[in-house]
């Protein structure tokens, strides 16, 4: 069985010049095999302080290449704590009081749009099956991009970082949000911080409203300490979902990787497998099915 690290080592290294900067990204092409139509795409966004290889190892979403997906992982433009960070509209980086001067010329939402265009030129991709995922700062960027991109995305998955920018008339593609009740970096109940002022359930509820879903979610206990809130639409689907994990801090639950798994500080949890959930969600909303 191929390990996550081996999968990442197979990834192609590419560069894209955007906004006067050379931006790097990793690409895993769909593994050869019969397919009836162009491939679905996942763009996986790293957290602040890490990079694309660490994100793919932690999320395990590179494994989707074996199921017919193309998987791309770009790199943020701002150096941060030994890794990289994304420039998010109107807010400073975590732990910083003001927006960096160097961030003023970086529009990472526009960069992601340019990346989608670049990938469309490199591979036969299905424009109706584009998916965006991210952890922490990557999830916050995914939230902004999902609103800005309109119908360019089939779905989005945000682990430890969902936000709801924009208003009720803005785009709201299917959303899977996973968050820990013990998260001290991006607290579940919000914080006195312009970067993270809205409680997670409120952000998801506003997303559901924009998507035309019921305001009151269906609540289930899917496992001990794991509560799912699913907002249904008029067709009976559940395209907006929040998974709250009681034992989880600021980590990607279920990953064996210590960088995303919070093993060092004890904030991780094996109560929920976010990687499997994200793969299943993408398969449900436009992607090829992947176990």
Give the positions of each predicted feature.
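Short substrate-entry loop that stabilizes the transition state in hydrolases
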Residues: 33-82, 153, 165-166, 184-187
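A domain-start/cap signature at the N-terminus of enzymes
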Residues: 1-41, 53-54, 69, 104-109, ...
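Acidic/histidine-rich helix-loop elements
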Residues: 82-101, 256-270
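Alpha/beta-hydrolase active-site loop
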Residues: 93-123, 144
């Amino acid at each position: 069985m191929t390990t996550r690290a081996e999968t990442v080592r197979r990834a192609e290294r590419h560069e894209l010049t955007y906004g006067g900067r050379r931006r790097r990204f990793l690409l895993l092409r769909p593994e050869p095999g019969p397919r009836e139509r162009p491939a679905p795409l996942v763009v996986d966004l790293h957290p602040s302080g890490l990079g694309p290889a660490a994100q793919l190892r932690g999320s395990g979403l590179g494994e989707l290449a074996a199921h017919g997906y193309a998987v791309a992982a770009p790199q943020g433009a701002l150096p941060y704590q030994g890794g990289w960070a994304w420039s998010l509209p109107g807010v400073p980086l975590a732990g910083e009081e003001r927006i960096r001067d160097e961030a003023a010329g970086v529009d990472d939402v526009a960069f992601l749009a340019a990346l989608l265009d670049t990938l469309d030129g490199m591979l036969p991709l299905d424009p109706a099956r584009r998916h965006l995922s991210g952890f922490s700062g990557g999830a916050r960027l995914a939230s902004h991009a999902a609103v800005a991109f309109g119908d360019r995305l089939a779905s989005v998955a945000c682990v430890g970082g969902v936000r709801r920018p924009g208003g009720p008339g803005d785009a709201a593609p299917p959303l899977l949000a996973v968050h820990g009740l013990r998260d001290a970096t991006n607290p579940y109940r919000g914080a006195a911080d312009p970067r993270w002022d809205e409680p997670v359930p409120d952000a998801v509820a506003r997303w559901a409203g924009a998507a035309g879903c019921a305001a009151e979610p269906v609540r289930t206990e899917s496992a001990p300490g794991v509560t799912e809130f699913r907002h249904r639409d008029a067709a009976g689907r559940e395209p907006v979902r929040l998974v709250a994990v009681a034992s989880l801090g600021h980590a990607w639950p279920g990953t064996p990787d210590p960088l995303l798994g919070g093993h060092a500080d004890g904030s991780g949890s094996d109560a929920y497998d976010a990687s499997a959930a994200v793969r299943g969600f993408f398969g449900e909303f436009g992607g090829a099915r992947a176990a």
